[in-house]
Amino acid sequence: MRILIAVQACLLILGRGSSVADAMADFDGWENVVVYPGDFPRTYDYEDEAGVVHRLDEPIAGESWYGGPVLLSWPAVEAGYDESGMALVIHEFAHKIDMLDGTVDGIPPLAGAARESFRREV
């Protein structure tokens, strides 16, 4: 279980930094990965066009919390790539790397010209 999650997570940091230690720094400060035996409930509130607030309970396979853990469903981890082509571990850990600079904007922490180049290409 741990190896499968770790290998997929490490795919995200291949080529980052000038050394393995630099690349692994992307994972500094992360404390927990919680693995559930199946999908798990997520409760959230949303407001519709009329201003009415609704509460929904929705089963999900993964979630990343800013300043918190990565939550994963083991069957989804084992599946690796489902019919949608999404690898859950890579998807959730990409969110965590995006959060490293304090801005959750879909862009990983990059310096100067690399950040601008990334913005232009996306």
Predicted regions, residues:
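Hydrophobic alpha-helical transmembrane segments and adjacent short intramembrane/lumenal linkers
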Residues: 91-95, 115-122
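Active-site scaffold of zinc-dependent metalloenzymes
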Residues: 27-90, 96-112
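Generic detection of long, well-ordered alpha-helical segments
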Residues: 1-2, 83, 115
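Extended cationic-aromatic binding surfaces that line active-site or macromolecule-binding grooves
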Residues: 1-42
